[in-house]
Design a protein with these regions (language model features):
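RNA-binding accessory domains that recognize and position tRNA/RNA substrates
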Residues: 2-193, 198-218
Length: 218
């Protein structure tokens, strides 16, 4: 498969829930995730970010959008999210995964850089995660011999990550840190006094991080 540089680089955002959500009971977790999805949709609507689908699978959200980088940066401010990764989506076929990794490596790696590949899978596939990593590394070194690239599994300049989920695969090289905490709106409202300058604002922000919508009082 030959990939064109004119093709949009990222078409998906992998949205990871905050760790606190994962340790809740099934009923509470479902409630929190539902609220989080509502908050994500509200942010996308507020910034007029187009998207085709927002799917919850395997304890994550997968946002299909042609504005993946912009969406990830805006959503990183949503309480309840731990991190977000603009990603390329493809099928779970080994050849297509490797082709996408080589394409992304060509855009991200510079002369003399080191790199690593990591792979995580959910489901049954005719290959192992280690086989994916070895093939990705081999093909990248083969594709860009003039860059003087090297593999470094401890402190690479660029890490190419592959997540295989049943019949789909997602390739990315970045993770944008989220603010964590709980989804805004899962706790009762609180009154926040804004007369104490920066300290009052910080206290209000921390209350929001615990899921409490603020009632601002000047």
């Amino acid at each position: 498969m030959r990939l064109s540089l004119a093709e949009p680089l990222f078409d998906t955002v992998i949205v990871r829930f905050g760790g606190e959500i994962g340790i809740k009971g099934a009923w509470t977790r479902k409630l929190y995730e539902r609220r989080l999805i509502e908050n994500v949709r509200a942010v996308l609507k507020h910034y007029a970010i187009p998207y085709n689908a927002l799917v919850r699978r395997f304890g994550r959200l997968y946002l299909k959008t042609p504005s993946a980088w912009d969406a990830a940066k805006k959503l990183s401010r949503v309480f309840g999210l731990s991190s977000l990764s603009p990603a390329l989506e493809t099928t779970s076929k080994m050849g297509e995964i490797v082709d996408k990794c080589v394409y992304l490596a060509g855009l991200r790696l510079k002369k003399g850089n080191s790199f690593a590949a990591k792979c995580r899978r959910v489901g049954k596939h005719p290959y192992t995660s280690q086989e994916v990593c070895r093939e990705v590394g081999r093909r990248i070194l083969e594709a860009y011999p003039l860059l003087g690239l090297r593999v470094d599994l401890t402190r690479p300049n660029v890490t190419l990550a592959v997540e295989v989920r049943e019949d789909r695969a997602f390739i990315y090289a970045d993770a944008i840190q989220g603010v964590g905490g709980l989804p805004l709106g899962v706790q009762p409202r609180v009154v926040c006094l804004l007369k104490g300058g920066a300290r009052s604002a910080a206290a209000c922000w921390l209350a929001m991080k615990r899921g409490c919508p603020p009632i601002l009082v000047h």
